[in-house]
Amino acid sequence: DLLANKTGADIARIETAEPYRGSHEEVVKQGKREVEAGFTPQINPLSVNLADYDVLAIGTPTWWYTMAPAVLTFLTVNDFTGKTVIPFMTNGGWPGHVIKDMKDKCKGAAFAHEMQIQFDSMGKDHLETSEDVITEWIGQIKMEINK
């Protein structure tokens, strides 16, 4: 939401049709199984039409060193030809290969301003990436949107 608020961009959440249920530990175990299997869950339709956009910032949390399965589904079922994708991810200190994996799945996209945003490795909400770095990145995105 910070990115949308600072850029004035629209926001659309990529959500699974079937929400994750259970304790944090159960959801983590399920997530690991899904990532290891390359599972692509059904996702809900977006609240926006991708055809209306030339620049898309697509973000994901890190799930076992790659993107969340819902984001994998989204990137797999859409064609990004002629669009600029700004891939970004959050992590707790282990970025893995998320950005590379996202780029590999974005068919036809050009890429700009990728970003890794790190939080506390102990599972807390403390931001480790400096706010100055994030502010600079948001400035780059604003310029990309206004080209």
Regions found by a protein language model. Name each.
Residues 7-9, 83, 109:
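A structural micro-motif
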Residues 1-58, 65-67, 72, 76, ...:
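N-terminal beta1-alpha1-beta2 submodule of the flavodoxin-like/Rossmannoid cofactor-binding fold
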Residues 50, 76-82, 105-107:
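Short, conserved loop/helix-junction motifs that constitute active-site signature segments
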Residues 54, 83-84:
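Surface-exposed loop/turn positions
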Residues 58-59, 87:
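Redox-cofactor binding/interface segments in oxidoreductases and associated redox assembly factors
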Residues 61-65, 91-94:
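Gly/Ser/Thr-rich loops at beta-strand to alpha-helix junctions
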Residues 86-128:
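Short, glycine-/small-residue-rich phosphate/pyrophosphate-handling segment
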